[in-house]
Amino acid sequence: MTLMLLDSASLWYRAYYGMPDTLLAPDGTPVNAIRGYLDMTARLIGMYSPNRIVACIEGDWRPSWRVDIFPDYKANRLEEDGEGEEEPDLLTPQIPILLDLLDEFGIPMVGVDDYEADDVMATFAVKEPGPTRIVTGDRDLFQLVDDKRDVKVVYLAKGLSQHDLVDKAWIARKYAIPGDRYALFAMFRGDPSDGLPGVKGIGEKGAALIANNYADVDEAQQGARDAHPSLKPALAKKIIEGADYLKIAPTLVNCARDVALPQLDISMPTKPADLSKIYEIKERYGLGASVDRLITALKW
């Protein structure tokens, strides 16, 4: 009864960079990201046999409620005009084709206005019964790991063939922190990929020490003010001086878990609405065996 949540942008970026850009449709349209995404999805279904699946997409990759409190949030990824997200020119035309194809396959796609895909996945993870497997290359989602409800992250940093299945023990081994405190750790450490600086002067070791001794930001700040022996004076001083950033860090780092999700059937599609449309897209864009592999994985 496994639910599989696909971090779609993470997958199509990984597919784009992992497949040769010489893969082209008959009309010259690049299709490497499309083919890679389909291939990964087929393999993931074969590995984990989910009975529910959602392709989660960005409603807004820089939600206003995060940017309003921290204008630099993900600003490092903005295009030169300061509007959209910078992405490879050869990837951009592939995304609408891929989304059309997923729609024809009957794979549910969910994106909610003013929320990131991370927030959508987090809400599904807390609202839907487990087991849940969250497929991503993004470590931000480690905060969703929940051993009691069997929520794990299929982490693709090393590729699908060598992926890690992240549970609390994995987090504890990797970062030397309690497995349920990754978000707290990230608040202090920061995340350059999202333009988040963390608390000035506190790196991974300092953040790990804090996460090992305190359950949340308020506790850590109180410990710093009290000059608790678990904190060296220099570290306590940095926590105190980082008070302004720490006021907003939870909103920036914690995934929203109360997104208003649309009512839809997230069961694995048992048959296509019109298989001929899938084959038409396959032929038009020269998608070859990638489409066939997903059809096989779905047991149509």
Residue ranges, per PLM feature:
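Noncatalytic, basic helical substrate-engagement surface that gates or grips nucleic-acid strands
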Residues: 1-135, 141-161, 246-248, 254-262, ...
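Non-catalytic nucleic-acid-binding/docking modules located in mid-to-C-terminal regions
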Residues: 49-54, 86, 107, 148, ...
